[in-house]
């Protein structure tokens, strides 16, 4: 006999300062200067998290700040977002990522669905919309894709999107660099 969960959890704040996390699978080879999920070494970990409410049918949480440096050279200066969700809708607000020379911002992202199990499969019933603004220097991603290490020019991206399931509509797509190149569609 299944019983309904009475889950009701609240955590006002979790603070992490000057944290350090290492993870090694000793049987796997190391790849200095390149991200390797088998050998992680995170230092200067800082986080401010808040779980306003977690219930069996809803979530309200905020990541005010997460930052760290990873041994491969990747540095997350700031990650932040607010998320609310229930059985029919997920809202992400003030999503932001800042790297050494890169900033990405999504003011709001909304996903609507008929039931929560549909969300991971992105069925046709899952509808979404949002907008994204970013200034990216691809070199910041070189620890994951070494070929990007030579790309030091900023690229500005502006994107407005919506869709359902795996169908994406982008009425606004602009990509520009600081030398006058602009691609719009």
What do the PLM-derived regions correspond to, one by one?
Residues 1-130, 136, 152-155, 161, ...:
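Elongated, acidic membrane-bridging lipid-handling scaffolds
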